Amino acid sequence: MAGAKALAANKWVDSSHMAIQGQSWGGYQVAYLIAHTDMFAAGGAGAPVCNMTSAYGGIRWGTGISRQFQYEQTQSRIGKDLWSGFDLYIENSPIFDYPKVKTPVLIMHNNADGAVPYYQGIEMFMALRRLGKPAWLLEYNREAHNLSNRKNAKDLSKRLSDFFDHYLKGAPLPDWMKPDTPYIINGQAKRLY
């Protein structure tokens, strides 16, 4: 936050139209920050973890390695297992603070992600939508943690531009972001509610 505040202090920065975007651990940071500040006009979260309590018991799909070490020892550095540090897992799981979210967010999470459980992006999206928050979820079938298909990468780039142009520059809401737009699963249009 110190860096964002330092940037906002510059005359050439419109501090009411700043955004945040991140992928993987950066996606987690976006998921966390939108629940703890309204400093950003919009956020983009790629492959985020939003609920460490549900992700803790998972595995890395590609290797079968437990995800527990990640929360105890590496990126999260909680230093305790889920049961002896339950309060720390809740505190570091932004989903429990989503009633406070004011920042619109575009989430991207793919169904072949072997690093971060795909259901984390779904949990984030469903929680925010259930709470009436502005949230969108993009999922690219058979794509992993990072996009490798050029067509999909271009699509994501275009949608990120649409999203940020709307919230940062006042561009019209793109059709794909409108509430009555169906989502597509395997070529079939569906509705969320």
What does each model-found stretch correspond to?
Residues 1-193:
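Active-site-proximal cap/loop segments of hydrolase catalytic domains
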